Amino acid sequence: VTLGVIGIIYGAVVATMQKDLKRLVAYSSVAHLGFIVLGIFAITTQGLQGGLLQNINHGLSTGALFLLVGMIVERRHTREIAHLRGLQKVAPLFAAVFTVVMLSSLGLPGLNGFVGEFLVLVGSFLTRRWWAIVAATGVILAALYLLWAYQRVFHGQVDDDNKGFAELTWREGAVLAPLVALIVFLGVYPKPVLERMQPAVDRLIEHVDENSDFVSPSVERPEPVEQTETEEAEPAATDEAADSDDPGDARAATGAASAPAEGGGE
């Protein structure tokens, strides 16, 4: 858990200092992996589901970001943020796709990144409250460096070197379309994926609970059964019959007390 939180904060802080767009995406990937580690080692249903879902989200969002950065480098032959400006005016479709992917990476509600990070934070809050609070600052830092990079690259006046920036081709769109579709789908309706992983998550939590001293708050424990008034009254009735002067009453009470024992032996 500690290493996961360190990865979240370290990746986010270093990403805010990057002037290279590809390196910025790479360090944001470190922060995403920190959320995955935090969710898994929280050992709660929400944490494990969030960690596994965030693993899928990481492949979709970060993979799409690396593809888009590669397309920028192919067109401009540079990764320096300072050399990229005003691309939204010359390639609006490219900017729109980049916007969706970037917002999913920072965890905007309605996209896949929000569901995974929310489950991780909720699950880890149950067992590691202060670590979850510290990890939540990574979400704020992600919004800081990703929005800053987007503003520098796609807004502002178009440089002369960027006026010839080409729009997305149909081949590039065919590659990015499935990724964007899954990003939106998992953000709106993650239930099929969560239900699919639920049995494995439950078995893992039970295994950890049975073979270690860790007690997961996700495991429901049966409450102790209280003795009923009828069960408490039977010994008292036997004692009263034993104290009675009538031998018949004593024999009847003794037979009634021994009947359950004989039935259990059979």
What are these regions (language model features)?
Residues V1-A149:
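Hydrophobic transmembrane alpha-helices and their helix-loop junctions in integral membrane proteins
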Residues A91-F94, L146-E234, D239-E266:
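Cytoplasmic/organellar membrane-interface segments at the starts of transmembrane helices
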